[in-house]
Amino acid sequence: MLRAVARCCGHWPPGAAAADGMLWQTELRPHAAGEFSMAAAQANLAMEDQAQVLASPAATLVGVYDGHGGADASRFLRSRLFPHVQRFEKEQGGMSTEVIRRAFGAAEEEFLQQVRQAWRQRPKMAAVGSCCLLGAISGDTLYVANLGDSRAVLGRRVVGGGVAVAERLTDEHNAASEEVRRELTALNPDDAQIVVHARGAWRVKGIIQVSRTIGDVYLKKQEYSMDPVFRNVGPPIPLKRPALSAEPSIQVRKLKPNDLFLIFASDGLWEHLSDDAAVQIVFKNPRTGIANRLVKAALKEATRKREVSFRDLKTIEKGVRRHFHDDISVIVVYLDRHRGRRHTRVVDSSSNCTNAPVDIYSSNSGQSVETLQAHRGSGW
């Protein structure tokens, strides 16, 4: 059991590198209820997205972690979230919303400890965070938990027809939403700056668009943002209470025969494709390479908006690419079999884990991740 979790939190399997060295995909792989497909595209100098699937005969875990301010928090989640889920699931004897809530809380607390330990040497760690999207399929029950603006969408067949419709399964915690702005204002009635329109978007404290994350300690604990050490990172930020939350939104539903597939993806995909467009692509095309097809559809839309060709995009280096699109991570999970068994365990001795590369460019170019991390001075 522990070896399976260790494999999941370690190296990625060999994937199919596209001609574009910033793309990655892997072949179709089995999970408890069918098959899944994964793909990713790098835009940032350091890949800030991370994605993984842990599959056993009993159940499936899916994780998409969209980092910001650096890759530390998303890489941390890649290595630590699933073990926390596994630990609490074992303690409680099955999957539940409480297991997921405790796993998110434990991950947040553990990352805070990492920030404390690195504070004097790397104060920038306090300004690093990540969105966190978790899916768990246990028997015929689906759990989806979310912090931030990554998204899970269900493709569902219309009863009596050959048409698929999209159903969004996540609440997005982004200040672009009027509901989120109202929530922030209600929680902070004495803070006129809790949500500000700055640099073309609504932002919490005029800084960050997402309102719930793992990390971003400087917007949760004033002792970090007001410490003189933090002045090397940014201006002091007075806080009467945490501006951001790590409390996930959790949805639970019973899977039905008309539920065809799930799409889990970072907002790098959704800023270019609608829920319905993504569902139609998956519904109308072969399974092989389907996640990569979604990534390429988003990239083509991004290039159309920027009035450059997709061929030209392939020549643009990492870092510069961020002006055209964000990092993109996509996992498509097909729902072929709905087992009615209850209290199934998430991890067992025959579990298999698939991770997207920590950094696509270094993976495709042959540069070791260890070398890349040493060059950046990363702690992960």
Swiss-Prot record:
Keywords: Hydrolase, Magnesium, Manganese, Metal-binding, Protein phosphatase
Induction, as annotated: By benzothiadiazole (BTH).
Alphabetical list of InterPro entries matching this protein: PP2C, PP2C_BS, PPM-type-like_dom_sf, PPM-type_phosphatase-like_dom
Residues binding Mn(2+) 2, per UniProt: D66, D267, D326
One Pfam match: PP2C
PANTHER family hit by this protein: PROTEIN PHOSPHATASE
Family: Belongs to the PP2C family.
Name this protein carries in UniProt: Probable protein phosphatase 2C 34
Organism for this UniProt entry: Oryza sativa subsp. indica
Lineage, top ranks: Eukaryota, Viridiplantae, Streptophyta, Embryophyta, Tracheophyta
